[in-house]
């Protein structure tokens, strides 16, 4: 169980349903079965206390640790490192080094459907499950996620355990297409098509 999954909720709007869905015992058990021993959760500003409450609510009592052993994370102020039920969970509000974290330490990304977060993962070629926040005023996240999924660049789901469990199975059995991380016409066209649809 050496693999690491990153859950990113974005920096501006918290996404409690995404955090709760990932912390559901059926999801953490599935991640362990798939070889993930660490879950890193970027939960957004002002969510630290709620994060710890959600861990206890869904997974029970936990032990806090001082470090998670990932340099880019251990530098983060107020990093929460928890050991519970055979899995390590690292939680933090925000990092300017998220793309570096993804590139060097992450095997799978479960992200909100913000364009910046999607692009951070696609640039470095990581498997990506996108969770649409359907509580937002318009459906721009759904439109973005659907377009990228049509291009076979990610798997798109809503914040519920059944859909996430299916996407985790897909991440083990299907291959996504990769995009070149340098500037190119194909990527420019993809972004243009996502933006105008």
Swiss-Prot record:
GO biological process: dolichol-linked oligosaccharide biosynthetic process
EC id: 2.4.1.141
Family membership: Belongs to the glycosyltransferase 28 family.
Recorded superkingdom: Eukaryota
Catalytic activity, as annotated: an N-acetyl-alpha-D-glucosaminyl-diphospho-di-trans,poly-cis-dolichol + UDP-N-acetyl-alpha-D-glucosamine = an N,N'-diacetylchitobiosyl-diphospho-di-trans,poly-cis-dolichol + UDP + H(+)
Complex and partners: Heterodimer with ALG14 to form a functional enzyme.
Pfam family, one: Glyco_tran_28_C
Enzyme class: transferase
A GO molecular-function descriptor: N-acetylglucosaminyldiphosphodolichol N-acetylglucosaminyltransferase activity
Cellular component terms (Gene Ontology): UDP-N-acetylglucosamine transferase complex
Organism listed in the record: Kluyveromyces lactis (strain ATCC 8585 / CBS 2359 / DSM 70799 / NBRC 1267 / NRRL Y-1140 / WM37)
Locations listed in the record: Endoplasmic reticulum
Protein name per the record: UDP-N-acetylglucosamine transferase subunit ALG13
Primary location class: endoplasmic reticulum
Keyword annotations: Endoplasmic reticulum, Glycosyltransferase, Transferase
Keyword set includes Endoplasmic reticulum: yes
Functional summary from the UniProt entry: Involved in protein N-glycosylation. Essential for the second step of the dolichol-linked oligosaccharide pathway.
């Amino acid at each position: 169980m050496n693999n690491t999954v990153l859950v990113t909720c974005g920096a501006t709007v918290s996404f409690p349903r995404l955090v709760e869905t990932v912390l559901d015992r059926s999801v953490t058990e599935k991640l362990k079965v798939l070889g993930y021993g660490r879950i890193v959760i970027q939960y957004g500003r002002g969510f630290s206390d709620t994060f710890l409450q959600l861990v206890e609510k869904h997974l029970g009592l936990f032990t806090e640790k001082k470090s998670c052993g990932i340099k880019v994370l251990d530098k983060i102020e107020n990093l929460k490192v928890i050991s519970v039920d055979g899995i390590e969970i690292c939680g933090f509000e925000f990092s300017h080094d998220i793309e570096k974290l993804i590139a060097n330490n992450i095997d799978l990304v479960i992200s909100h459907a913000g364009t910046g977060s999607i692009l951070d993962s696609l640039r470095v070629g990581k498997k990506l499950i996108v969770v649409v926040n359907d509580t937002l005023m318009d459906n721009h996240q759904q439109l973005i996620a659907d377009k990228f999924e049509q291009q076979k660049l990610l798997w798109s789901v809503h914040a519920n355990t059944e859909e996430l469990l299916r996407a985790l199975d897909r991440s083990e059995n299907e291959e996504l297409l990769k995009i070149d991380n340098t500037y190119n016409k194909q990527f420019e066209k993809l972004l243009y098509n996502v933006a105008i649809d």
